[in-house]
């Protein structure tokens, strides 16, 4: 049975911070994103993570993107990666894929998905989805996949029109095929499929204002921050999708549907999460 949900009706609360809390316990998020020439995706994702409450945000990206990231958000610990690196166990959430393409640098980054800290939750978005399709090894961590219809079409080898005819079943099939704990199939009335409970949720917020580049990067960053603050995959997925879509509605009501740029969502999301 499909369960509709909206931001206005969710009863999901980010845990209140204790008076003696510190940055290390409020979410330690690593974002691996941004091939050469696609640095904006990693910058947007990391900014969304930062402004959604994560205590520590690190961005591992192509060396060419480091300067822009540090100018935009000096709070994000940005590292230019060219060779093998070790992923520390300090990260409890890892987001992989925004701004990744099929190139040598991205292929090097892919190798690390099979050597993650066991407790780290993993979000795979955008170019990362192509990478998991192309490799045969199973990733043992809890995974959230966040495809749009085009990416879902590529994952399953069927047409976008077939995807759109049965979005709920598509999300379920992707989850089963790639052993994902959760699949978020983006688009009009975003679908969330939870593998463990077999529940399907359909978001009633949002509209065509979100159909612009970068909004998916912002969404994945928000969800990463919520996971880092000890929400479950279920809670972080529902709240992340709903607050992102509601932010789009608020922007469209004020400025119209056609002028939204993805980073304009971030300050609105910041205010909504305060509630």
Language model regions located:
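Small-residue (G/A/S/T)-rich helix-start motifs and N-terminal tracts that mark the onset
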Residues: 1-121, 130-144, 153-275
């Amino acid at each position: 049975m499909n369960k509709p949900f909206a931001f206005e009706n969710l009863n999901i609360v980010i845990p209140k911070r204790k008076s003696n809390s510190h940055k290390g316990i409020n979410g330690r998020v690593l974002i691996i994103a941004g091939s050469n020439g696609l640095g904006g995706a990693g910058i947007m994702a990391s900014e969304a993570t930062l402004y959604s409450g994560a205590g520590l945000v690190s961005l591992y990206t192509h060396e060419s993107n480091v300067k822009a990231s540090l100018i935009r958000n000096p709070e994000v610990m940005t590292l230019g990666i060219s060779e093998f690196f070790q992923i520390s166990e300090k990260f409890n959430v890892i987001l992989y894929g925004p701004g990744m393409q099929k190139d040598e640098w991205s292929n090097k980054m892919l190798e690390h998905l099979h050597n993650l800290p066991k407790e780290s939750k993993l979000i795979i978005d955008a170019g990362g989805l192509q990478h998991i399709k192309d490799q045969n090894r199973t990733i043992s961590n809890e995974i959230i996949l966040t495809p749009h219809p085009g990416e879902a079409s590529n994952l399953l080898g069927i047409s976008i029109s077939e995807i759109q005819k049965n979005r709920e079943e598509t999300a379920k099939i992707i989850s089963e095929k790639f052993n994902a704990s959760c699949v978020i199939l983006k688009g009009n009335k975003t679908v969330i499929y939870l593998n463990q409970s077999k529940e399907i949720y359909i978001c009633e917020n949002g509209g065509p204002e979100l159909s612009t580049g970068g909004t998916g990067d912002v969404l994945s960053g928000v969800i990463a921050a919520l996971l880092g603050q000890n929400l479950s995959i279920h809670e972080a997925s529902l709240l992340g999708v709903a607050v992102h879509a509601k932010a789009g509605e608020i922007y469209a009501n004020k400025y119209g549907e056609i002028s939204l740029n993805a980073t304009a969502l971030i300050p609105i999301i910041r205010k909504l999460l305060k509630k």
